[in-house]
Amino acid sequence: MPLDLYNTLTRRKERFEPMTPDRVGMYVCGPTVYDTAHIGNARPVVFDLLFRLLRRLYPAVTYVRNITASDDKIIDRRATTGADRGADQAHRGPLPRRHGPLNAAPTIEPRATHHISHMVALIGLLIEPATPTPRKGTCCSPCRRWRSTGQLSRRSLDEMIAGARVEVAPYKRDSSDFVLWKPSTDGQPGWDSPWGRGRPGWHIECSAMAKEHLGVTFDIHGGGLDLILPDHENEIAQSRCAHAGEPLARYWVHQRLRDRRGARRMSKSLGNLLHRGTSCWTEFPGGGHPLGVRPYRSRGLPEAEESKATLDRWYQALRGDPAPAQAELPFDVLAALEDDLNSPLAISHLHELASAVNKATGEAEKAAAKGRCRSAERWAAPETRSVVPLGAEGAAALSDADIQQRIEDRSAARKAKNYAEADRIRKELADLGIVLEDGPQGTTWKRA
């Protein structure tokens, strides 16, 4: 079956057809690393699911997910906390580890600070020779140069700025303009440019990095629903202005947001975070369509727990002597995923596969059923990793040295009276099937 995706650009589900038949490029907006990762940051696992599906369907797939390491929020956090410029690395550090259990790794993960020259070059295409010298070293992009601004959000420029009640900055010629390059003070990070020492505006980062790694136009651009306006609108505007109207991406896919207490989206800027730690299962894409705002329920988490229980049964069914995998992914699972990533339906089919193993009576029947399960496992984890380490399977993925290092980290946290961090590490190991026992001689561990 062909792949169908909901395209925010057209507001309908469309047949996916890549620009090049055997090659797909996908860019997804990653985190801004000014605070610890929270459970909402795990939602992009939806794009990992799409990445795996695309790799099954096409010979070559490039998945780019950026890291924003130079941003006003990062600068403000440093000023507030007194942290140095390495602080973003501390917040970025947990991301690979915490995404590790989710097994959600992109092909390329560029950092904004490593692409300043590309941003300067792109801004140079937007600043026309006849444009007056930028005021106070600030370059702005005139949105009205591109008439289709608003095509993602379905809002006109006048609607976007109507009622804003915000005074227009003196360096802007129009209230709809957005910053491409801004000056930096002595205490702020900055780079040399034709417009003086400064740093890039937020939106130019993704346009420049996507162009560098995927080209002027690529297949899929992903991100959260909250990025449609103004982030993705501005990316489209500046990219099309810079490249004679060429589109930035052909398909725009937006994942749902995590909403806390049924009120607002969960985000660092709103200060309503629940840090992920080991809450990976609240984000498993088995609880509904990737579009929309998903409420976080602190008690029960029935959808996530049901998904986890299903895959627990799946792994349990595969324990013992390994059975050879079938060549193809079971049709029902594949068909569900090809229908706009219908992960709830795919999960239900995985449950059926595991049930078939448990219900099989003869050795031949059981081997055939296990083979169908193995095909799903190997498709989902082509690098010979499990989809998500669970229980004993997760423990097996950790070496003794890894476990001992986490125990030492926990001991250091306890000595520093950082009991929340110590408890988090203990819970993290417990979720991976590692049981810790504290005694007079120190901490010992065993695999559950």
Curated annotation (Swiss-Prot):
Motif 'KMSKS' region in this chain: 265-269
Keywords recorded for this protein, A-Z: Aminoacyl-tRNA synthetase, ATP-binding, Cytoplasm, Ligase, Metal-binding, Nucleotide-binding, Protein biosynthesis, Zinc
Chain sites annotated for binding Zn(2+): C29, C206, E235
Cofactor: Zn(2+)
Compositional bias ranges of the Basic and acidic residues kind: 79-91
Matching InterPro entries: Cys-tRNA-ligase, Cys-tRNA-synt_Ia_DALR, Cys-tRNA/MSH_ligase, CysS_C, Rossmann-like_a/b/a_fold, tRNA-synt_1_cat_dom, tRNAsynth_Ia_anticodon-bd
GO cellular component: cytosol
UniProt motif 'HIGH' region: location: 31-41
EC number: 6.1.1.16
SMART domains reported in the protein's UniProt record: DALR_2 (SM00840)
Catalytic activity: tRNA(Cys) + L-cysteine + ATP = L-cysteinyl-tRNA(Cys) + AMP + diphosphate
PANTHER family from the UniProt entry: CYSTEINE--TRNA LIGASE, CYTOPLASMIC, CYSTEINYL-TRNA SYNTHETASE
Family: Belongs to the class-I aminoacyl-tRNA synthetase family.
Record-given protein name: Cysteine--tRNA ligase
Organism lineage: Bacteria, Pseudomonadati, Pseudomonadota, Alphaproteobacteria, Rhodospirillales
Gene for this chain: cysS
